[in-house]
Amino acid sequence: SSDLKNQFFSVAAPYESGLRNRYVNAGNVENKGFEFSIGWYEQFTDHFSWSTNLNFSYNDNKIKELVDDLPNGLTLTDFGGAKVILKEGGHYGDLYVRHLMRDENGKPLQNEKGEPIVSGDSMDELEYAGNMNAKVNMGWTNTFRYKDFSLSFLIDAKFGGKVIGMTEAALDGWGVSKRSGEARDAGGITVDGVKFDADKYYRTTGNNNFNSPYAVENYVYDATNIRLREVTFGYTFRNLLGAGKNLTAAIIGRNLFFFHKDAPMDPDVSAGTGNGIQGVDMFALPTSRSFGLNLKLNF
């Protein structure tokens, strides 16, 4: 375990100071975790072998201290209806979101216009949606060799964390998504027994502009995913052209497919490199699947 102390963060400055922001020492964040790696190599015959390696890591954190003048915590990121907030006793990356207001029976409320009612953005009204960071990361590499052929692949996985589909929210809010179109064709949308006009529902709960107070709870997904990260298939041409040189040719494929994911986008997406915006899809380019050829000549 380790403690990270005196991290610098930008917070709003008092109005009378004439400044927009000031920097503070945020306090003390305690990290606890472990990592281990285990490997195995087996030569089954003179021509066939297998090697494997598994890497596993776990990390959790807790905010032990914050500066005294932040009674509502430190907001790292505020986008529309979601905030990443640091609170004493909480965790780095805790996500709080606006949500549909409901009655005592769990049914969504609507105003006199027939629009769903979305909560405010004060700490008392926001709903805790989970933590943005995955607690468990895993990678598993395997290599098989038979005579001059080789096959290797890497499977990696992340367990836990949250991602936000802001692209999805915007398309809903603008009324151009598949689901909003289907709702219009169906004459409305029913949510937990309450029927809404499709346009009124999605314009309110979706993100019709990037600062609108939409119901982010509808667009938060589990970031858990397991993917085939890389596959390499190669062959070694020995004593090439009788010159005593070997040429290894390998076909490489990366980001081939997911074995499992809950989010409609790649959970590794990020809206930028700043604090609190990892795991946010904001019209990001789709993750590419790539193929390549590698040639290696040994003298």
Predicted features by range, described:
Residues 4, 46, 148-153, 240-241:
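Repeated loop/turn-to-beta-strand initiation elements of outer-membrane beta-barrel proteins
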Residues 7-12, 58-77, 161-187, 259-269:
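Outer-membrane beta-barrel and related beta-rich outer-membrane complex signature
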Residues 10-21, 115-124, 204-217, 271-277:
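Flexible, solvent-exposed coil segments and beta strand-coil junctions
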Residues 23-31, 77-107, 186-194, 198-200, ...:
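C-terminal beta-signal and terminal closure region of outer-membrane beta-barrel proteins
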Residues 24-30, 34, 41-132, 172, ...:
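Conserved small-residue
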Residues 34-42, 50-58, 138-144, 149-157, ...:
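Membrane-embedded beta-strands that build the outer-membrane beta-barrel scaffold
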Residues 158-248, 252-254:
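Extracytoplasmic gating/loop element in the C-terminal half of outer-membrane beta-barrel translocons
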